[in-house]
Amino acid sequence: MNKIKKVAIIGAGPAGLSAAYELAKAGYQVEIFESSNAVGGMAKTISLWGQLVDLGPHRFFSSDPRVNQLWLEIIGQNYSMVSRLTRIYYKKTFFDYPLKALNALFGLGIFQSTLCVTSYLHSKLFPQKNEATFDVWVSNRFGKRLFSIFFKSYSEKLWGISCQDLDADFAAQRIKKLSLYEAIKAAVFTGASKTKHKTLVDEFAYPHQGAGAVYDLMAEKITSLGGHIHFNAPVDSVILAKNIGEDPKIKSVSGEVLSFDHIISSMPITQLVGRMPVPDAIKDHANQLTFRNTILVYLQVEADSPFPDQWIYVHSADLQTGRITNFKNWVPSILNGQSETILCLEYWCYDSDPFWTMDESSLIAMATKEIHQTGLVADDQVKAGKVIRVPKCYPVYATGYRKHLEPVEKYLSDLPGLSVIGRYGAFKYNNQDHSILMGLLAAENISKGASHNLWDINTDYEYQESCRITATGLSWENQS
C-alpha cells in the first residue's frame, strides 16, 4: 500500500464522498470537511411540506461500469426506473425533447418548419468554419433558425452571456454527436441504435428517497468504516508543503491548522487558488473564471400533477425561469402520501446581479406569476413558496476560458499532496456520474499509485466498456 494514510477531503458532494468511500474501504483515515450541514452537494435531497425534493432535477445515468457498480453498491435495490418525459416550452407550445419530426412540424407550423429545414440544409452546404463559439457550433448542426428557437434563449438565460460569447466546449460536452439529423433519426427509427446519446436517454434510475439518498447512505458507510465528516466546517485555505518531508495542511475558518498526507479538494477552484500563495499570473488566470448561481423557487400547488413531465425547459424569452421541475412525476415514495404537487422553478444569475439578493417574497411572487403565465397552474392553486439559493452551480465556459483554466490546471497538477476534483473543484460542467468517477479515480491515484489525469474527466469522457442500470441491476452493452 502507498505510504499515504491520512487524507483530507474538502467537500461532501458526489466527488468528495466517492473518493472518501473508496479510500476508507482501502483502509485510509479520511476526514471530510463540509461547509454546510448536509452531504450531497447539489445532488442532496431535502424535506419540504412533508415531501422529498431535490435541488432541481437530478436524474442519474452512466454507461461507466465503475460508476454504476458503486451506485448500486450503495443504493442496493432501493430505486426505480423512471420513464423520462421532458419537453420544451416555447411560445405557449410544448415540443418533445428529444425532437420528434411530426411534433416539431405541427408545433412550429408548416411555414416555420420549412424555414428550419431550409436553414439546416444551408448549414450543411455552407457550414461556418470557425466553431469556437456555441452559436456557430450549434448552427452548423441544427441550422441557424432552429438554433434561435431551441437553443439561444435558454442558453443565454442559463449563462447570462450572449451565445457568441459562450465557448463551443459547452455544446461539445453536452450535445456531442447530436444534430438535427441524429435527433430525427432517433425519433423516426426507434431502436435503430443500441447506444443512445446521453441527451436522448429515455429511462433513468432514481432512488426511492430522492437523489440525495445515495450520498446519505455513502456518508453512513464512510462513518462505519472509521471516516469522519465535519459539518458546518468550511475550509479557509490549503497550505502545501514547502520542504521535503512536510505534510500539506488545511486551515479552517476558525484558524485551526491540521496536517494530512494528502488533500483532495472539491471547493471552488477560484476560492482554492485565491487563498493559496501562488504566482500572481496563476491567481490572475483563476480570477477570470466565473460561476453562475441558481435560485430555486419551490411552489406548493394544490392540484394533481399540472403536467406529465419530470421537468420542462422554458425557452420562451418572455419568462425568466429556465426550467420547471415537477416532483409529482418522479417516484411515488418521495411524496410521502401527500396530495399536493411541488414545482421548482429555476433562475440563474451572477453574484453581482441584484436578482441574487432579491427578497424571498418577491421571488415567490415572480415565480407564481410566471407559472400562471404558462397556463399550467391556475391563479388560486399556489398555496406556499420556498426559496433556496445555490451559489456557484455552473462553471461558465465563456469564450477563451481555456486560456485561463489550463495554466491553473497545470499549476495545481504539479503540486504534490493535492488532488482537485468535482464540478466546483475542477471547473467542469459535470453530471453526478462524472463527479463520482473523478472521486473514484482520485482515490485510485492515492491507494494504487495510478496516474489518472483527473482533468480529462467530464461529459466528453469516453468509456472503454459500457453498461447501464436497469430494474434488475447492470446490463452490459456491446460497443462493437
Feature roles, as predicted:
Residues 5-32:
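N-terminal Rossmann-like FAD-binding beta1-loop-alpha1 element of flavoenzymes
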Residues 447-480:
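Active-site-proximal substrate-binding core of FAD-dependent oxidoreductases
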Residues 24-47:
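Glycine-rich FAD pyrophosphate-binding loop
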Residues 49-126:
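Dinucleotide-binding Rossmann-like beta1-alpha1 core, especially the glycine-rich loop
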Residues 93, 114-237, 241, 248, ...:
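Active-site/ligand-binding neighborhood in enzyme catalytic cores
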Residues 260-262, 269-419, 425-430, 437, ...:
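C-terminal segments that line or cap access tunnels to active or ligand-binding sites in enzymes
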Residues 229-276:
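Acidic, glycine-rich loop-and-beta core segments that form the ion-binding/anion-interacting portion
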Residues 15, 38, 270:
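Conserved Rossmann-like nucleotide-cofactor binding loop
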